Amino acid sequence: DLVRSRGLGDVYKRQILDSVDFICLNNPEKLSSETQAEMVKIREKNIRTLSCINYESLEQEWNNKAKDNSELTEEDAQRYLNERTDAMLVLCDNYGYDGILIDYTGLSMVGMQEDVLQQYKARQQNFFSRVLDWRIKHTDKTLVFYGYVQYLAPENMDMLDKYNHLILKTASSKNMEDLTLNVFMAIQAGIDVAGTNAELVPKDRFIACTQFPQQEDKDMIIGYWDTRDANGNKVLAAQGTAQWIVQASPDYTCTGIFIINIQKDYYNNTYGTVRETIHIMNPNK
């Protein structure tokens, strides 16, 4: 099980569950000495800490830079993105992270104009080639892909077996059927590229993503499914996702759950919703 948080301090002080496997930090740069010490402490509980590289954030940095200078070229863009990617990758060694989560949403390539498509594919290739170079030198670290497999260019599909986990972007899913559809869309993307006899998309390492309700969301949209329980209450997305995970499928294996912004479990300071969610997947916990 993975959780995503802005920082370790609040999570650690609230004595996060031992059954959580990974914590992913949204802001992995400029870690305080206190946070680094906490990473060591939770590692003693076999809880590992991942840094996050959000590719869209890097592109947004470049777009903000480029809008003020019309003379900048695509070559400049590639150079900037490469430098920023390298700077983010080196954080794993600098701060002693246990691995990296690659957050890459991407875009649908259907109907893209040719020049836009070529730029999209070139930037994607550059980014992931650097990630894979890092992987070769860090085989003992955990590498996680968090994104839409179907938005990867065909030439990048064969890298997926280098990742320990493939997290599906299902935070906005509203029922079990939608989760299943997301899995099959990822698998189908590999089949479309390689044919039915090849499995470019590993089927044994999927993780579903979900999120908690937010206190300011009075309409109960975020963190809830459209379905209701026996008492007529909206099903919590985290618990619905956990119930989906434990339903075995002959076509794929879902190995865990990824919870965004764990600090949103505001109901009490002992992470009650997290506990209930994990208990669904592992009644012994």
Where are these regions (language model features)?
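Conserved, mostly hydrophobic/aromatic
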Residues: 23, 102, 166, 257
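Single conserved hydrophobic/aromatic residue that forms the stacking wall/gate
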Residues: 2-8, 12
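Acidic (Asp/Glu)-rich catalytic clusters
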Residues: 14-17, 33-48, 90-95, 155-161, ...
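Aromatic- and acid-rich polysaccharide-binding/catalytic face
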Residues: 106, 153-182
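Substrate-binding cleft of secreted/luminal carbohydrate-active enzymes
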Residues: 204-285
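Substrate-binding cleft of extracellular glycoside hydrolase catalytic domains
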Residues: 28-123
